[in-house]
Amino acid sequence: MAMKKLLIASLLFSSATVYGAEGFVVKDIHFEGLQRVAVGAALLSMPVRTGDTVNDEDISNTIRALFATGNFEDVRVLRDGDTLLVQVKERPTIASITFSGNKSVKDDMLKQNLEASGVRVGESLDRTTLSDIEKGLEDFYYSVGKYSASVKAVVTPLPRNRVDLKLVFQEGVSAKIQQINIVGNHAFSTEELISHFQLRDEVPWWNVVGDRKYQKQKLAGDLETLRSYYLDRGYARFNIDSTQVSLTPDKKGIYITVNITEGDQYKLSGVEVSGNLAGHSAEIENLTKIEPGELYNGTKVTKMEDDIKKLLGRYGYAYPRVQSQPEINDADKTVKLRVNVDAGNRFYVRKIRFEGNDTSKDSVLRREMRQMEGAWLGSDLVDQGKERLNRLGYFETVDTDTQRVPGSPDQVDVVYKVKERNTGSFNFGIGYGTESGVSFQAGVQQDNWLGTGYSVGINGTKNDYQTYSELSVTNPYFTVDGVSLGGRIFYNDFQADDADLSDYTNKSYGSDVTLGFPINEYNTLRAGVGYVHNSLSNMEPQVAMWRYLYSMGEHPNTDDQNNSFKTDDFTFNYGWTYNKLDRGFFPTEGTRINLNGKVTIPGSDNEYYKATLDTATYVPIDDDHKWVILGRTRFGYGDGFGGKEMPFYENFYAGGSSTVRGFQSNTIGPKAVYFPHAASNYDPDDDYECATQDGAKDMCKSDDAVGGNAMAVASLEFITPTPFISEKYANSVRTSFFWDMGTVWDTNWDSSQYSGYPDYSDPSNIRMSAGIALQWMSPLGPLVFSYAQPFKKYDGDKAEQFQFNIGKTW
């Protein structure tokens, strides 16, 4: 079209200037039709200037130059004496862009596509570009199986040479696969081969991966899956001869036929390595060992190539080339693998840079590095730095990029690109149960205080039965070697009776200081000291409580509830952490083991020890880590020594969102057995079941939890992709199905003495529940929802099916 207009304009010029075919001197240049484009801008785009002598060729070049600006639909150049007259028709300006009928493609994606083609509000409209966009969008719909889709660009003229642009979509329905045929397979059935495809002609209800909707990209992936399936089983000559995709007349059905040649199975006869091995031939040879008579396996060959690259990468060879060429012997059905290695140049690290850490200081990230500047590049050291940054929990994502230094043959820069997450939080917890009602708790925590890496927290609980506050500070790098220093102070006023626990009041306060010593990349030891003061009062006489008091040399009256007791204890605190999780926030792979314990030291009123062991293991079952199995355990044990018992207020409890969901917090395990009250103290409204002997009250059984000195909790969780959540938010939302179990018992309970009551020393009284949980790092903060149904419980257990926590982050 442009060339046609150019030809017409040239002919017009020629016919108007027959007498001037030899050219003329331009004394002036005038424009007609300019509206949006400035005269100066138009003049700058022209090769002709006032005073130039021009001929027909110059005029043709002028027309081409004006068309090339993209601002004009039509250009004519005429001569009026010694004046060059340029007549133009500007392209209309796009005033607005709207979309209608698009469901599969979001508006933002469409706008990005249009802008990439130069179509945006305020720019000139090129109608030829619209045709290309229409075709490109329709091709996209065809690739996802929507063959009846159409896209039409509607241009509505507006005053002042403006237009409204509207893209109207008719997406239609996705064509469904009616049948998939594989022709030429003999070793494996068609059903077996198709079972590994994403595309299916039949999808069982339980298959959440299979899809009958045709997509060109998925078919290409399935063909690669088919190829790998055969190559991994020794079929080195396997070939996909052709693929036919047939569409039904109504464009709603798809028939797929894949023609293959299986060939025979081949065994590996040997591996021969050659090339520039950079002095690491022995290590490389070790990576290429094969078992005699082993079938040829394409995946193992690829892994071998990757392992060689990783090996060389650890020694500074950042860009090695490894190529494997199978040499097939059809006579004896063997394959000899020839591996050519070119290690390339060895690289130094010039600089390590960080991008995206707007809050965190560079020093906080740099101290996690194992790769040093000025040293040989080690790919394993770079990866360790990435792992350590992920485990900090400060970042949503951490990516690395090794960039060559321009002009240098042996230097690179290592760039860590991070996306920070909100590490400060104000947490507000709510629980609701049919028997417990509503409970609240709150806390303020900043894990990366002012970007320094310090962890600062103020946590508290305020409800009907407890007032708790705690201030904690941890410096993870108290020394340059990574020794951490942490401390806390706390105050707790606990009314156990109002918490459906055994009746007593404990007002306590204390502090502790802990040092952490890194042993290696994954192991840390901790040691510290602590002090705690406990002031007990209003202790209603019950067996476990009185047993402890007797061991402490106290002999309170079992008919008196107004007993009081105070202790001051100094403890040696210890711990060990093994952490090989892939990241600190929403891990998907790895294991974390945490051991914490304490023991009283001389100068304490109590003499006891206590320890807990927590483990969590994440096992991904797909390459993208979207489907993950999580196993968690928690074990606890404590006891007294020197003839004393562990204090009852140090007992272990289970139940609640952090242990066994579906049960009210802290209510699993032994229940209080009270001594008979004096008549003046007995409250008939208390939920006691009292036995009588000779007309007098004997011991009274209750539903009040007292905990125990031993605990075991386990959980099996299946983490799945969250439905209806886009990829953009996938890292911020986690859905899981879980099965929790747990038990708490008292090893010092004498069942022979209390034969008419449950045996609270029996660890086999296991509670179980199952349910679903949703975790979301929302703009308002972390939200955790769970719904669990207890399916194994005992008398006195309290259910709390629905639990959730909400918070505010900054």
Curated annotation (Swiss-Prot):
GO terms under cellular component: Bam protein complex
Principal location: membrane
GO biological process: Gram-negative-bacterium-type cell outer membrane assembly; protein insertion into membrane
Keywords: Cell outer membrane, Membrane, Repeat, Signal, Transmembrane, Transmembrane beta strand
Domain POTRA: residue ranges: 24-91, 92-172, 175-263, 266-344, 347-421
Transmembrane segments: none
Pfam families documented for this protein: Omp85, POTRA
InterPro entries the record matches: Bac_surfAg_D15 (IPR000184), BamA/TamA_POTRA (IPR010827), D15-like (IPR039910), OM_assembly_BamA (IPR023707), POTRA (IPR034746)
Record localization: Cell outer membrane
Signal peptide: 1-20
Chain's role: Part of the outer membrane protein assembly complex, which is involved in assembly and insertion of beta-barrel proteins into the outer membrane. Constitutes, with BamD, the core component of the assembly machinery.
Assembly, per entry: Part of the Bam complex, which is composed of the outer membrane protein BamA, and four lipoproteins BamB, BamC, BamD and BamE.
Similarity-based family: Belongs to the BamA family.
NCBIfam families, alphabetized: OM_YaeT, PRK11067.1
Name of the protein this chain belongs to: Outer membrane protein assembly factor BamA
